[in-house]
Amino acid sequence: MASTATCTRFTDEYQLFEELGKGAFSVVRRCMKITTGQEYAAKIINTKKLSARDHQKLEREARICRLLKHPNIVRLHDSISEEGFHYLVFDLVTGGELFEDIVAREYYSEADASHCIQQILESVNHCHLNGIVHRDLKPENLLLASKSKGAAVKLADFGLAIEVQGEQQAWFGFAGTPGYLSPEVLRKDPYGKPVDMWACGVILYILLVGYPPFWDEDQHRLYQQIKAGAYDFPSPEWDTVTPEAKDLINKMLTINPAKRITASEALKHPWICQRSTVASMMHRQETVDCLKKFNARRKLKGAILTTMLATRNFSAAKSLLKKPDGVKESTESSNTTIEDEDVKARKQEIIKVTEQLIEAINNGDFEAYTKICDPGLTSFEPEALGNLVEGMDFHRFYFENALSKSNKPIHTIILNPHVHLVGDDAACIAYIRLTQYMDGTGMPKTMQSEETRVWHRRDGKWQNVHFHRSGSPTVPINA
């Protein structure tokens, strides 16, 4: 008879110690593998509290972390599911945040900044070669392996990371951290690997002067700055920065993602690969002083958010391999990871694609209609007299014989749209459709129908797989 015993491998093999960080559904604790004495950081997720979508995200994070093996990336050593909990066993990184270490140094130069960004670029390049986009590159996720001098920079927190095919650009949702978001994400355009390079540009700018290129307490104004690429190199602090460093920043902060420098190209830039002869060795005390203020502002706003989170269930709050004070920040700062806005943006996306589909119908554009619909589209509609219709032939008849031949103006609006998101790649929308048209006598008329549409995303594109319409037929009968 098959054993139904619950897995207790983590409990059997590891000993837990103090807490290192905390999120809404997870806690990070130091642990030790009993057989070897080797220390790790265990991210312990309470799976009883996770939604189906959160489960998918956890599986994605574990899958991505298992794939990435690089000296500049926090390594996942084990992933164990037990009753009610999932354990992700990572490298124990004890050096804290890179930015906190820099301000404690007695000497810090452009050459040091070059060495830091080189390690970050190595980690990003490894991600991109493996089809992974991090999406949340920022100081909080740049850690040091140990307190030793010259310890490696480690990229952490793959909670928002996504898997992409080659140079695929698609809309993967609104996610990231405000001050580090790329113009294409803010425009809600398809995006891919270049978003990480934009964030690298923001990080490099801060590494050189201690403050960010884009900053405003008002998030809308901040986003306008980013979309316009409105940054500069003000005097006097930038006067002592070499032209090569500024050139690399300009190549990273290029608005057009197709023209933005890639990680592999950036690693070949003279300021990186010829550091000893190109980057300045002058100590940058002003940068260290500014960076102290920048860090203090991040920590203060983090403390405010922690207080806010204590009073509500906030699933986006998460902590991975952070120092106890490495907390997230309030939404008006530029350092808060945002993914809840992703839900709002995705719902808006479903409304937009539904409007595009209706526009194709109004225009009698069967080609545009077929691009938005799944070839096996199923439907219940008044024209089919209660029968389930499958495929496109039934609809083709109306496009060829009624819709395309109607040259009278038709105007449609969607009222009270309600969108239900079903996981990452499916959604359902219900709405009332009002269609205005001119009848045969030149009189304005209005038709109303109630519609529900089911959408499925394949290869980054939404397709209508089913709809149910009651009320008036689509085509004005006496038009």
Curated annotation (Swiss-Prot):
<dbReference type="InterPro" id="IPR011009">
    <property type="entry name" value="Kinase-like_dom_sf"/>
</dbReference>
<feature type="active site" description="Proton acceptor">
    <location>
        <position position="136"/>
    </location>
</feature>
<dbReference type="GO" id="GO:0005524">
    <property type="term" value="F:ATP binding"/>
</dbReference>
<dbReference type="GO" id="GO:0048168">
    <property type="term" value="P:regulation of neuronal synaptic plasticity"/>
</dbReference>
<dbReference type="GO" id="GO:0004683">
    <property type="term" value="F:calcium/calmodulin-dependent protein kinase activity"/>
</dbReference>
<dbReference type="InterPro" id="IPR008271">
    <property type="entry name" value="Ser/Thr_kinase_AS"/>
</dbReference>
<feature type="modified residue" description="Phosphoserine">
    <location>
        <position position="319"/>
    </location>
</feature>
<protein>
    <recommendedName>
        <fullName>Calcium/calmodulin-dependent protein kinase type II delta chain</fullName>
        <ecNumber>2.7.11.17</ecNumber>
    </recommendedName>
</protein>
<dbReference type="Pfam" id="PF00069">
    <property type="entry name" value="Pkinase"/>
</dbReference>
<keyword id="KW-0112">Calmodulin-binding</keyword>
<feature type="modified residue" description="Phosphoserine">
    <location>
        <position position="315"/>
    </location>
</feature>
<keyword id="KW-0723">Serine/threonine-protein kinase</keyword>
<dbReference type="GO" id="GO:0005516">
    <property type="term" value="F:calmodulin binding"/>
</dbReference>
<keyword id="KW-0597">Phosphoprotein</keyword>
<dbReference type="InterPro" id="IPR032710">
    <property type="entry name" value="NTF2-like_dom_sf"/>
</dbReference>
<keyword id="KW-0547">Nucleotide-binding</keyword>
<dbReference type="GO" id="GO:0106310">
    <property type="term" value="F:protein serine kinase activity"/>
</dbReference>
<comment type="subunit">
    <text>CAMK2 is composed of four different chains: alpha, beta, gamma, and delta. The different isoforms assemble into homo- or heteromultimeric holoenzymes composed of 8 to 12 subunits.</text>
</comment>
<comment type="similarity">
    <text>Belongs to the protein kinase superfamily. CAMK Ser/Thr protein kinase family. CaMK subfamily.</text>
</comment>
<feature type="modified residue" description="Phosphothreonine">
    <location>
        <position position="337"/>
    </location>
</feature>
<feature type="binding site">
    <location>
        <begin position="20"/>
        <end position="28"/>
    </location>
    <ligand>
        <name>ATP</name>
    </ligand>
</feature>
<comment type="function">
    <text>CaM-kinase II (CAMK2) is a prominent kinase in the central nervous system.</text>
</comment>
<keyword id="KW-0067">ATP-binding</keyword>
<dbReference type="Pfam" id="PF08332">
    <property type="entry name" value="CaMKII_AD"/>
</dbReference>
<dbReference type="GO" id="GO:0043005">
    <property type="term" value="C:neuron projection"/>
</dbReference>
<dbReference type="GO" id="GO:1903076">
    <property type="term" value="P:regulation of protein localization to plasma membrane"/>
</dbReference>
<keyword id="KW-0808">Transferase</keyword>
<dbReference type="GO" id="GO:0005737">
    <property type="term" value="C:cytoplasm"/>
</dbReference>
<dbReference type="InterPro" id="IPR017441">
    <property type="entry name" value="Protein_kinase_ATP_BS"/>
</dbReference>
<feature type="modified residue" description="Phosphothreonine">
    <location>
        <position position="287"/>
    </location>
</feature>
<dbReference type="InterPro" id="IPR000719">
    <property type="entry name" value="Prot_kinase_dom"/>
</dbReference>
<feature type="domain" description="Protein kinase">
    <location>
        <begin position="14"/>
        <end position="272"/>
    </location>
</feature>
<dbReference type="GO" id="GO:0014069">
    <property type="term" value="C:postsynaptic density"/>
</dbReference>
<dbReference type="InterPro" id="IPR013543">
    <property type="entry name" value="Ca/CaM-dep_prot_kinase-assoc"/>
</dbReference>
<feature type="binding site">
    <location>
        <position position="43"/>
    </location>
    <ligand>
        <name>ATP</name>
    </ligand>
</feature>
<keyword id="KW-0418">Kinase</keyword>
